[in-house]
Amino acid sequence: MAVPFRRTGKTAKRKRRTHYKLSNPALVLCKETNTFTLSHRVTKNSGYYKGKLILENKPSKAQKTTDN
């Protein structure tokens, strides 16, 4: 079984681990609702993508029960 010749020091270990980091998500401003959303995605609250209506909002189950 292979064994390291020398022990890895704290500094070398920490320098190697500094590159593991998260990047900021690409957010864009929705023209319809003026809220930030992820780019290249349909907005959840309005259903618009690139200024066009893609998804129509369906009434939730709670609203359906109160309407009857």
Swiss-Prot record:
GO terms for cellular component: large ribosomal subunit. Coiled coil: none annotated. Keywords: Ribonucleoprotein, Ribosomal protein. GO terms for molecular function: structural constituent of ribosome. Transmembrane segments: none annotated. The keyword Ribosomal protein applies. It comes from the Bacteria. GO terms for biological process: translation. Belongs to the bacterial ribosomal protein bL32 family. This is Large ribosomal subunit protein bL32. It comes from Onion yellows phytoplasma (strain OY-M). The gene is rpmF.
